[in-house]
């Protein structure tokens, strides 16, 4: 059997294969209330029907002010749970495990009114200047991640991912470019890591399932975080109880990364080896053979697919055929692969 279609365990959760749908914002909550819609159900469940092992929902805000836009999903109140439970049931009906990415946009929120960040530094000259979070407000953010994790449990999710990448709030705390604080949340790396550590520990108080953290392994900017900074961060995450690190890059500043097939694989490889923690990797992985090579060379443990799954919900089915594997799909569509 190919490695790509072997089972993988995240704590007590067994994935049927190593293909993961990357969280990708759809900006499709037209009512602006954070509640998942029929579109979200069709969008995610179709990828489960296509054979994806783990489907991770897009960035889901833990606070209303933490949305990237007014059209984001949310888990800041109980009214948002039932629609997500319905969606999770749909994922499970096709044999996929269900994950959700809990997030706070920080200074990258594009919303009416006040936005917040670790320091009062705007994303760019076109963006609103955020208000620096007080210590009390930081503790409330941590508490809201915990509350959202509890709601995710109520909705039946199998996996929680904490979004600490792409220039959003937690990443803003981690990077010295965006964190100029002089209290115990700023300065040395251990202080800048504190909010993420506090969030992980708070989530674990209500959640006994696997926790993934998405990181940006380089800021692509002078004075920002580089790969070597993430080895100690990853070790601390492992000690805090994180099962796997989802390795991406960039997003903190308005700089386009150099992009080519598998461009983030070296980052996942180095973190995996340097910190002794499992990693998932994404970034222009578009073919089954490419994914298999990454796994067989032990450069990552899970393959996270983004845009290719937008183009092709049946990526898993097609990847299996390319690797000489047979996986079941919806019987209604079986003639498509004869």
Swiss-Prot record:
Keyword Oxidoreductase: yes
Residues involved in FMN binding: 22-25, 59, 101, 214, 306-307
SUPFAM superfamilies to which the protein is assigned, alphabetical: FMN-linked oxidoreductases
GO biological process: one example: response to toxic substance
Annotated keywords: Detoxification, Flavoprotein, FMN, NADP, Oxidoreductase
Broad EC category: oxidoreductase
NCBIfam families (UniProt xref): PRK13523.1
Subunit note: Homotetramer.
Stated role: Catalyzes the reduction of the double bond of an array of alpha,beta-unsaturated aldehydes and ketones. It also reduces the nitro group of nitroester and nitroaromatic compounds. It could have a role in detoxification processes.
Listed name of the protein: NADPH dehydrogenase
Gene name linked to the record: namA
């Amino acid at each position: 059997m190919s490695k790509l279609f072997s089972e993988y365990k995240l704590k007590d959760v067994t994935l049927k294969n190593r293909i993961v749908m990357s969280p990708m914002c759809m900006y499709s909550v037209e009512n602006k209330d954070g509640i998942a819609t029929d579109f979200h159900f069709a969008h995610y469940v179709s990828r489960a029907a296509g054979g994806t092992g783990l489907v991770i929902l897009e960035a889901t805000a833990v606070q209303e002010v933490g949305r990237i836009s007014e059209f984001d999903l949310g888990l800041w109140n109980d009214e948002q749970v039932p629609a997500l439970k319905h969606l999770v049931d749909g994922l499970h009906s096709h044999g996929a495990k269900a994950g959700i990415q809990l997030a706070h946009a920080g200074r990258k929120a594009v919303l009416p009114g006040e936005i917040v960040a670790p320091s009062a530094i705007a994303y760019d000259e076109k963006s609103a200047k955020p208000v620096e979070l007080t210590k009390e407000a930081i503790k409330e953010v941590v508490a809201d991640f915990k509350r959202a994790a509890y709601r995710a449990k109520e909705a039946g999710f199998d996996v929680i991912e904490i979004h600490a990448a792409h220039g959003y709030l937690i990443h803003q705390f981690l990077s010295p470019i965006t964190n100029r604080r002089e209290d115990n949340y700023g300065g040395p790396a251990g202080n800048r890591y504190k909010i993420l550590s506090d969030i992980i520990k708070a989530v674990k108080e209500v959640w006994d399932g696997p926790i993934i953290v998405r990181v940006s392994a380089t800021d692509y900017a002078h004075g920002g975080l580089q790969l070597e900074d993430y080895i100690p961060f990853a070790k601390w995450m492992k000690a805090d109880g994180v099962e796997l690190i989802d390795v991406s890059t960039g997003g903190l500043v308005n700089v386009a990364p150099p992009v080519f097939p598998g461009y983030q694989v070296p980052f996942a490889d180095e973190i995996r080896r340097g910190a002794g923690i499992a990693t998932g990797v994404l970034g222009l992985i578009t073919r089954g053979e490419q994914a298999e090579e990454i796994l067989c060379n032990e450069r990552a443990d899970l393959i996270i697919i983004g845009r290719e799954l937008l183009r092709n919900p049946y990526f898993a089915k097609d990847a299996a055929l390319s690797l000489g594997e047979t996986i079941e799909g919806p019987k209604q569509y079986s003639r498509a692969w004869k």
